[in-house]
């Protein structure tokens, strides 16, 4: 008696040679993204911007279509995001900042995230958060490098979420316009 053969299906990106470029869906329309970054702890947060741009370009958005805006701190991010969303110039907005534990961390982080969600829902411009609130950040301590790495990883993650959401919304808007949904 022989057992039935099974075939393993793998993701082509996992089996592609390291030099092969990955292929992503193309956007039907040009996309423009605003990246609003806190300048507080810029040396830690900057990796988020750098990895975001690298990844978003790989996903099909031209680097010249990604604009960087710096604000003093994370608390100032939502107002800038709202003003940028109201211009209708951007198809997506990313927020990046570091909220340091000073007794108000929970209040500031919750306020910022809720405000970003409110902007997104009111304007229908997707807003992505790379605002981090570590419990143990001290400038100059050995864990500073850990947080730099975290922001670099977060930048790539938010680029993927941004591109995937823009593609999803583009399809959804097309279906709505066609009366399918």
Curated annotation (Swiss-Prot):
Pathway assigned to this chain's UniProt record: Cofactor biosynthesis; riboflavin biosynthesis; riboflavin from 2-hydroxy-3-oxobutyl phosphate and 5-amino-6-(D-ribitylamino)uracil: step 1/2
Gene3D superfamilies on file: Lumazine/riboflavin synthase
Region (Disordered): 1-23
Keywords: Riboflavin biosynthesis, Transferase
Domain of life: Bacteria
Pfam families: DMRL_synthase
Amino-acid positions noted as binding 5-amino-6-(D-ribitylamino)uracil in the UniProt annotation, renumbered to this chain: 40, 74-76, 98-100, 129
GO CC aspect terms: cytosol; riboflavin synthase complex
One Gene Ontology biological process: riboflavin biosynthetic process
GO MF annotations, alphabetized: 6,7-dimethyl-8-ribityllumazine synthase activity
PANTHER family (UniProt xref): 6,7-DIMETHYL-8-RIBITYLLUMAZINE SYNTHASE (PTHR21058:SF0), 6,7-DIMETHYL-8-RIBITYLLUMAZINE SYNTHASE DMRL SYNTHASE LUMAZINE SYNTHASE (PTHR21058)
Alphabetized HAMAP family for the sequence: Lumazine_synth
Name listed for the protein in its UniProt record: 6,7-dimethyl-8-ribityllumazine synthase 2
Lineage, top ranks: Bacteria, Pseudomonadati, Pseudomonadota, Alphaproteobacteria, Hyphomicrobiales
């Amino acid at each position: 008696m022989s057992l039935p053969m099974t075939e393993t299906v793998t993701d082509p990106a996992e089996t592609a040679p390291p030099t092969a470029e990955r292929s992503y869906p193309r956007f039907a329309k040009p996309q423009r993204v605003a990246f609003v970054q806190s300048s507080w702890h810029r040396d830690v947060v900057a990796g988020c911007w750098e990895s975001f741009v690298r990844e978003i370009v790989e996903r099909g958005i031209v680097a010249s279509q990604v604009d960087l805006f710096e604000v003093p701190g994370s608390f100032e991010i939502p107002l800038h995001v709202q003003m940028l969303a109201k211009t209708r110039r951007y198809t997506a907005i990313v927020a990046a900042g570091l909220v340091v534990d000073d007794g108000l961390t929970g209040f500031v982080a919750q306020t910022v995230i809720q405000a970003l969600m409110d902007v997104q829902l009111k304007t229908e411009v997707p807003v992505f958060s790379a605002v981090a609130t570590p419990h143990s950040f001290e400038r100059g301590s050995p864990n500073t490098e850990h947080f730099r790495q975290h922001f670099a990883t977060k930048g790539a993650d938010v680029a993927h979420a941004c591109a995937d959401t823009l593609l999803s919304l583009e399809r959804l808007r097309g279906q709505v316009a066609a009366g399918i949904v």
